[in-house]
Amino acid sequence: MAANKDYYDILGVSKDASDDEIKKAYRKLSKKYHPDINKAPDAEQKFKDVNEAYEVLGDSQKRAQYDQFGSADPNAGFGGGGFGGQGGFSDFGGGFEDIFGSFFGGGQRQSPNQPRQGEDLQYQMSLKFEEAIFGKKTTIKYSREALCKTCGGSGAKEGTSPVTCHKCNGTGTIQVTQNTPLGRMVRQQTCDVCNGTGKEIKEKCPTCGGTGHTSQQHEVKVSVPAGVEDGQQMRLQGQGEAGFNGGPYGDLYIIFQVQPSDMYERDGSEIYYNQTISFVQAALGDEIEVPTVHGKVKLKVPAGTQTGTNFRLKGKGAPRLRGNGTGDQHVKVKVTVPKKLNSGQKEALKQFAKASGEEPSGHGKSGFFDKFMN
């Protein structure tokens, strides 16, 4: 890696950019400047710069080292050594930890050319209310970084293979002598030729530019379990992005977004429904049909039922995702009063009121019967 390159500027992102923002910028620019697509004289060099920038900023350890020293050259952070400069010890950030870590305990760190699992991905899946209750089988499509089909992930041109790095002899790291406030010290850093892989690619694959990865459309069959709720997620192992140095694929997390129902409310495995009945049904009792997600069922309404009374329909709710059985449906009744009555209905109610000792007052329109008999 060349010194004094502004990798953030190359990718067109800010220094506080998230990992996702860096990845998106890399994908966009690598496609834009790919030599097979862009025939501009400087396209190949820009393509190399973009890949070089992502090799650093796309790796948290390499990015931290780059941010610490301000360039790809770790010596740049010391500004010529000594205690000079504007900040003294503060100029080094976490430098002492890195120095002593590599000098005394560097062997405990993970090797940079060790296989690493690929990135995890998220997929938002919209479900209808009933689909979340009963589950469904579907196929989803999404874009992911996969192993290059041309080189099989090696990054080398077809017919060639990566060779052991001539600079680090396959270790992925090199020893660098640095001038520090404590004198000259030797520290270990990622090899700038193979970028920590231990392998050197003499002729890069024209499809992926030596990264071993390309953006590909991917399909996967999904079985949505019955009883899922809004916001819950399901993990599909190995359906994320390709790994590094022979590492496994990452995972895919499907996040469910359940659409609300016009008829029902849901709380876990319990379903709630509002049912209207007439004041005659409430007074005399009746057997009515109530809709459920499982189909219509009969419900006996006892005589004298009041507005706000709740009934429970056993087993007519949603399946319990964790545990056995199914929840219930709760039916809350609302007694409705007609706004207009014909003469026969009015006379019948007057007789009912008289028999009940509730003769209408006849004064104004404040009485119960006056509200719907006039």
From Swiss-Prot:
GO biological processes: chaperone cofactor-dependent protein refolding; DNA replication; protein refolding; response to heat
Zinc-finger is among the record's keywords: yes
Cellular compartments annotated: Cytoplasm
GO cellular component: cytoplasm
Cysteines joined through disulfide linkages: none
Keyword tRNA-binding set for record: no
UniProt domain J: residue ranges: 6-70
Keywords in alphabetical order: Chaperone, Cytoplasm, DNA replication, Metal-binding, Repeat, Stress response, Zinc, Zinc-finger
Recorded superkingdom: Bacteria
Binding site for Zn(2+) 2: C165, C168, C191, C194
Gene3D superfamilies linked to this entry: 6.20.20.10, DnaJ domain, Urease metallochaperone UreE, N-terminal domain
Cofactor notes: Binds 2 Zn(2+) ions per monomer.
Residue ranges covered by zinc fingers (CR-type): 135-217
Location of the region described as Disordered in the Swiss-Prot/TrEMBL record: 308-328, 347-374
Single GO MF descriptor: ATP binding
CDD domains in alphabetical order: DnaJ, DnaJ_C, DnaJ_zf
CXXCXGXG motif repeat feature ranges: 148-155, 165-172, 191-198, 205-212
Listed InterPro entries: DnaJ, DnaJ_C, DnaJ_domain, DnaJ_domain_CS, HSP40/DnaJ_pept-bd, HSP_DnaJ_Cys-rich_dom, HSP_DnaJ_Cys-rich_dom_sf, J_dom_sf
Cofactor(s) named in the record: Zn(2+)
Subunit-structure text: Homodimer.
HAMAP family given in the database record: DnaJ
Domain notes: The J domain is necessary and sufficient to stimulate DnaK ATPase activity. Zinc center 1 plays an important role in the autonomous, DnaK-independent chaperone activity of DnaJ. Zinc center 2 is essential for interaction with DnaK and for DnaJ activity.
UniProt family annotation: Belongs to the DnaJ family.
Protein's name in the database: Chaperone protein DnaJ
The species this protein was found in: Pediococcus pentosaceus (strain ATCC 25745 / CCUG 21536 / LMG 10740 / 183-1w)
High-level lineage: Bacteria, Bacillati, Bacillota, Bacilli, Lactobacillales
Gene name linked to the record: dnaJ
